[in-house]
């Protein structure tokens, strides 16, 4: 029979599926856990690709960044399918035609007028190599498709055309996804939980300029959703679940063959100080406790940020 549409447009998703399949087959205790314990999840870089940055940075050319939607789709297939998401529109995968210098993407098989772009993320053009999702730093130096990059969708021009930014660099065809929004919320008793997506919309950080007012961890839409949801919450306690740490930087490498060499490493909110400090000030002014649950860093700790705001981090000790 015919391969699924996503395999035709993003064949490297099969490798991600195989990873999940292998973990569940070999990790008997892990498989038992998933069988018996209902869970909600947040994705971090290792669900996508190690040290993935700049997925929301318009014009950014990076193999890891544009693997986002392939990995996220597999994550939803195996883990996040039950997550309480704010938007349940899956990523859209298409095959586009590009002309050098043109800001128009054409796809005769698409009907962009039927897509709710407010429920979707930005557009990436795939790297286009069979090793695009392999965890190996040496591959970062290898070239991908000349049009592979992070793009802004400027406007829908018709059923088969989008205006994008930046313009294409070369004539050609390549597959692309328009990403999904993975964040959501749920309530238990008198507590509201907000599950953040800290990888899909983040701009490039700068360790040497962590206070850059334009830098964003969450993107404008998710940031506004978070503040609005908390401001209008009737709960007595707020739990904000972030895959990356809030107060402690994550700058150390785990070693091996996959060190991120294209940008100085820091996965945490410590390089997005404008957003972080705005949230702390906002939370501290509430008449309810706010607890930020974080991971990523291979350590565990508790930090009293203010009398009203705490971070509790839980990570593997290795």
Can you say where each PLM-predicted feature lies in the sequence?
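Long, structured stretches of catalytic cores involved in phosphate-ester chemistry, encompassing
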Residues: 1-318
């Amino acid at each position: 029979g015919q391969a699924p549409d996503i395999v035709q447009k993003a064949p490297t998703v099969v490798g991600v599926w195989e990873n999940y399949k292998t973990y569940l087959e070999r990790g008997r205790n892990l498989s038992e856990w998933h069988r018996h314990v209902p869970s909600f999840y947040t994705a971090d870089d290792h669900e996508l690709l190690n040290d993935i940055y700049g997925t929301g940075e318009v014009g950014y050319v990076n193999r890891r960044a544009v693997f986002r939607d392939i990995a996220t789709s597999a994550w939803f297939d195996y883990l996040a399918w039950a997550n309480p998401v704010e938007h349940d529109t899956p990523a859209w995968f298409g095959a586009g035609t590009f002309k050098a210098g043109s800001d128009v993407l054409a796809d005769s098989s698409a009907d962009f007028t039927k897509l709710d772009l407010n429920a979707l993320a930005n557009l990436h053009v795939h790297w286009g190599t069979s090793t695009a999702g392999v965890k190996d730093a040496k591959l970062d130096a290898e070239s991908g498709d000349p049009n592979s990059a992070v793009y802004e969708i400027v406007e829908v021009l018709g059923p088969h055309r989008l205006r994008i930014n930046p313009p294409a660099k070369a004539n050609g065809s390549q597959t692309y996804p328009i990403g999904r929004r993975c964040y959501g919320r749920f309530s238990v008793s008198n507590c509201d939980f907000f599950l953040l997506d800290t990888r899909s919309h983040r701009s490039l950080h700068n360790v040497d300029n962590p206070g850059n007012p334009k830098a964003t961890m969450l993107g404008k839409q998710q940031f506004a959703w978070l503040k609005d949801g908390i401001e209008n919450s009737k709960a007595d306690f707020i739990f904000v679940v972030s895959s990356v740490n809030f107060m402690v930087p994550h700058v150390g490498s785990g070693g091996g063959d996959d060190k991120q060499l294209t940008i100085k490493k820091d996965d945490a909110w410590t390089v997005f100080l404008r957003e972080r400090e705005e949230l702390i000030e906002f939370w501290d002014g509430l008449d309810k406790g706010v607890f930020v649950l974080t991971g990523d860093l291979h350590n565990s700790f508790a930090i009293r940020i203010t009398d009203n705001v705490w971070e509790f981090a839980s990570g593997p000790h290795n």
